[in-house]
Amino acid sequence: LRVEFENRTGATWPLNIGQVYTTLDRLERDGLVAKEGDDGEGHVVYSITAAGKAEVQSWFAAPVERTNPPRNELAIKLALAVTLPGVDVQSIIQAQRVASIRSLQDYTKARRDTAASQRSGDTAWLLVLDSLIFQTEAEVRWLDLCEARMVQQAQSAGSGAARKTSNGVTEDATPLNADSRR
């Protein structure tokens, strides 16, 4: 099951095998899967029941709710950084931008290589890669917005120091942290 999941999702998300067994036990208890025996190599074989198929169809048909935003470590890091004196928020933003652009290049290359290979089953991996690319592009745009907000805030505080950004625009270069907000 783990291998099949990884094949279908491009092994993007590691699957905790212990969680798989716990989930299979719960699915069996709820009548959504049934044990069929073993495969001769010590692996239990499960099959999906009619109720399980109906549950999967319901899951596919239901939109993914965005009521509880997922934990975003970067957003938390920046939110904390701007509230603490002495933290160079600009450096955090720049380091993340470099890492995000590197990831974006890797994802784009993987998408190009996968599209060129034209192997069966690549469509699922291409969908995952497209999602990762769009998320990373959005992160870079968000980092640009964070930087612009921090610069605007520093300028509002009346600082006169200047620096050049990656796109050549001269902006306020006061260290971007909670001290610059006061």
Name the predicted role of every residue range.
Residues 82, 111-118, 150, 154:
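Secondary-structure edge/capping motif, primarily at the C-terminal ends of alpha-helices
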